[in-house]
Each structure stands twice: as structure tokens, then as C-alpha cells.
UniProtKB/Swiss-Prot annotation:
This is Type II methyltransferase M.MjaIII. S-adenosyl-L-methionine binds at residues 9, 13, 63, 199. One of its GO terms (molecular function) is sequence-specific DNA binding. It comes from the Archaea. Belongs to the N(4)/N(6)-methyltransferase family. Signal peptide: none annotated. The lineage of its organism: Archaea, Methanobacteriati, Methanobacteriota, Methanomada group, Methanococci. PANTHER family: DNA ADENINE METHYLASE. It catalyses: a 2'-deoxyadenosine in DNA + S-adenosyl-L-methionine = an N(6)-methyl-2'-deoxyadenosine in DNA + S-adenosyl-L-homocysteine + H(+). Its EC number is 2.1.1.72. Keywords: DNA-binding, Methyltransferase, Restriction system, S-adenosyl-L-methionine, Transferase. It comes from Methanocaldococcus jannaschii (strain ATCC 43067 / DSM 2661 / JAL-1 / JCM 10045 / NBRC 100440). One of its GO terms (biological process) is DNA restriction-modification system. The keyword Signal does not apply.
Length: 289
């Protein structure tokens, strides 16, 4: 079974999986890594790739985005009911004409924002996935109040979900521990037999390229510095570490001095100027091996 991400997600790693594979620690390929830990799991491209290819005794994932982590939890524990909810959203949406589809989208978005705390979890996740597949460019963006505020996307025939893929994801997540919080939440799980992959919100290369508003918590330079300190702390523990970030050589060269810093080419799928969706851009991979 081939498992693919079930959400569109900013900074998704599908485009650089081959470079990530080339740079994985040899201990992983030799079967000496027992634990995989990913504190910025996002859309899960790296997680799904590694879980299909390598054996781990323990897998721990986390992200600060509560709705995202609820998604993983529901897909893992209640996939059949989720598929029912999604089917009903999809069928109603696809039966409407364009103008009514737009109205339906905003109705679901309002429900999603209003019922944050007292909505049934499965229903909420179905709304989350529906919005992700029908909103503009598949973005996830919230305002400071934490309200999802992306406009309608006007796709002709959006594929809201892939039933078989969701079931496969559910199987793959069976033994995965799902956390939610700041990246330091994984600290207690990391030991010398761990491989940790960090994929934080990228430091913007310029003012317009910033896309870190997928939580109401900004990830700024202070957070990048805090993350680098955490990276050094885990390095001393003997864990194998890999981190992705933007091609900002001056900033990261100083921050991760002494580590193995490589330049890789990524193709970006989410970009507001639709015609530039597949530009190749450089990124950094930073490893402690």
C-alpha cells in the first residue's frame, strides 16, 4: 500500500523526499535506529515515507497546530466514521452549482470557527479536511483569534478525500504516539537510538515569502535560535538529527556552525501566484552526522 499525505500543507516535503532519503543517517539504513521523532509533522510526507520504508520500535509525532493533530488522532482512531462524515460533506457540495458551492464553503467555515470547543471531534476533522481541499490554494491560515480565514478556492472538481488512502494512513498510524505542542514537547522521548527530523516554519527569505501563519503563534528568529539550542542539546545526547530550513546561509550558517549543512533544490507546490507553483528553490538540510 502506498500512503500519501491526506492534506495539502505549506512547506510539504514531497518535493525533496529523494534528497532527504540520500541524506538519512547510515544507522537508520543499517537498522540501528529504534525511534523516529518528528516535532513539526505538518502534512506528514516524511513521516509516511519513512514508516513505509523503515522499521521503528517507537514513533512520536507532534505539531503546535491543535486542529492538525486532532486530524491525525481521528484518522488513527476513528477512520470509518470520519469517512462517513466526509462523504456527506462531499456529496452535498458536489451536488450544488458554483454559486451554491461557494455559500456552502462559507457555511462550513463559519461552523468550523464557531464550534471550536464543543463540536464532535470527528465532525470537526471532516470539516477541516473539507476546507483544506476546497479553500484557496489549499492553504491553512488563521487570524490572531485562531479563526480559519482562507477564502473559497473555486476548483472544478476537487477531490475532497481518498477513502483507501485514509484507511492506509490509519493503519500506518496504529502505533504512533500523537502529541500536540511546542517542539520541546518531544524532549523526554529522545535518546541515542533516535532519529529526529525537524521541519520548522521556515525563516522567510524576503518580506513577501513569509508563510508561517498556520498557527496563531508566529515562529520568529528567537524561536529559530531556541530551536538551534534544542538541536545542540539533543546532539549531545547522541541522537541523529536532520533539520530543513530556507536557504538563508548567513543566519543558519552561524546558528548551526559545526554541523553538516547541505544545499538542496525543492519545488514548492503552495504559492499564491498560481503560475509560479512549481518554481525550484534552494533549501538547507542540516545534519549532525
Amino acid at each position: 500500500m502506498e500512503v500519501k499525505p491526506f492534506l495539502k500543507w505549506a512547506g510539504g516535503k514531497t518535493q525533496i523526499l529523494s534528497q532527504i532519503e540520500e541524506n538519512l543517517p547510515k544507522e537508520l539504513k543499517e537498522g540501528n535506529i529504534k525511534k523516529y521523532i518528528e516535532p513539526f509533522v505538518g502534512g506528514g510526507a516524511v513521516l509516511f515515507y519513512l514508516l513505509q520504508k523503515y522499521e521503528f520500535k517507537k514513533v512520536i509525532i507532534s505539531d503546535i497546530n491543535e486542529d492538525l493533530m486532532l486530524c491525525y488522532k481521528v484518522v488513527k482512531n476513528d477512520v470509518d466514521r470520519l469517512i462517513e462524515e466526509l462523504s456527506s460533506l462531499r456529496d452535498e457540495f458536489l451536488s450544488l452549482d458554483e454559486e451554491k458551492r461557494k455559500e456552502f464553503y462559507y457555511k462550513v467555515r463559519d461552523d468550523f470557527n464557531k464550534n471550536k470547543n464543543d463540536c464532535d471531534e470527528v465532525k470537526r476533522v471532516a470539516q477541516f479536511i473539507f476546507l483544506n481541499k476546497t479553500c484557496y490554494n489549499g492553504l491553512y491560515r488563521v487570524n490572531k483569534k485562531g479563526e480559519f480565514n482562507v477564502p473559497y478556492g473555486r476548483y472544478k472538481n476537487p477531490k475532497i478525500f481518498d477513502e483507501q488512502n485514509l484507511k492506509n494512513v490509519s493503519k500506518l498510524l496504529k502505533n504512533v504516539k500523537i502529541l500536540c505542542g511546542d517542539f520541546e514537547i518531544v524532549d523526554e522521548y529522545v535518546d541515542a537510538e533516535s532519529f529526529v527530523y525537524f521541519d520548522p516554519p521556515y525563516k522567510p527569505l524576503n518580506k513577501t515569502s513569509s508563510f508561517t501563519s498556520y498557527t496563531k503563534y508566529d515562529f520568529n528568529d528567537d524561536d529559530q535560535i531556541r530551536l538551534a539550542k534544542f538541536y545542540r542539546k539533543l546532539d549531545k545526547r547522541g541522537a541523529k538529527l536532520m533539520l530543513s530550513n530556507s536557504y538563508n546561509v548567513d543566519f543558519f550558517g552561524k546558528l548551526y556552525e559545526g554541523f553538516n549543512i547541505k544545499k538542496v533544490v525543492a519545488k514548492r507546490m503552495i504559492n499564491c501566484k498560481g503560475d509560479k507553483r512549481k518554481d525550484g528553490i534552494y533549501e538547507l538540510l542540516i545534519m549532525n552526522y
